[in-house]
């Protein structure tokens, strides 16, 4: 099993080269040596540390499954000797690039308008936003005095209401000529006068439950009086005839 993985490795290295990683060829720095003297003293011997290079070679040559030497111990200064973890097995770390910058440049490349707006000053950007927020198109119904937009309810003054009531009592139906005269006299439009009279007629019908309006009341009374007079005259004539018949019989 081990030979299957070892053979490709030997084809890459020459006979004089070794498979020893580069990070083992380091020396103790002065700070580590100084700490060693403080911990163990000048005359004390440091714990046993054995270079693991021959174990690596034995592993590839003999196919051993692991390091079987019981005397091997991990020294506390091993991390300082080995150096940075990014240089493990001789590989150096690649230079890091800011991810946010690359993503931002990619998005700005797709949308050049955003890039041009970001390059401007903040004050100019705020002005640009305020200009964009305002509507660019003005439709007719958005204007204050648009023809298709409904106006508020018309309020009539006391003088206008009084004059309209007088005109309604005189004649509930106005001709076109009289409507124009009333509208000019009261500073109203012809349509406003027409609507007021329509509403007033409906109100009067609901209050009185009658079909005849106040302007037609005099005519109706006159007709009723005439009918009553005719009936009275007819009754008087009949009474006279009956009296004459009775006298003749006697």
Swiss-Prot record:
Gene Ontology terms: biological process: embryonic pectoral fin morphogenesis; endocrine pancreas development; exocrine pancreas development; regulation of transcription by RNA polymerase II; swimming
Chain segments carrying region Disordered: 112-152, 206-250
Annotated compartments: Nucleus
One Pfam family, short name: Homeodomain
Transmembrane annotation, as ranges: none
CC annotations in GO: nucleus
Residue spans of biased composition, Polar residues class: 115-136
DNA-binding region extent: 149-208
Motif stretch (Antp-type hexapeptide): 138-143
Keywords noted in UniProt: Developmental protein, DNA-binding, Homeobox, Nucleus, Transcription, Transcription regulation
Domain of life: Eukaryota
Composition skew (Basic and acidic residues), residue ranges: 206-220
SMART domains: HOX (SM00389)
GO molecular function, one term: DNA-binding transcription factor activity, RNA polymerase II-specific
Compositional bias per record (Acidic residues), positions renumbered to this chain: 221-241
Task performed by this protein: Sequence-specific transcription factor which is part of a developmental regulatory system that provides cells with specific positional identities on the anterior-posterior axis.
Family membership: Belongs to the Antp homeobox family.
The protein's name: Homeobox protein Hox-C8a
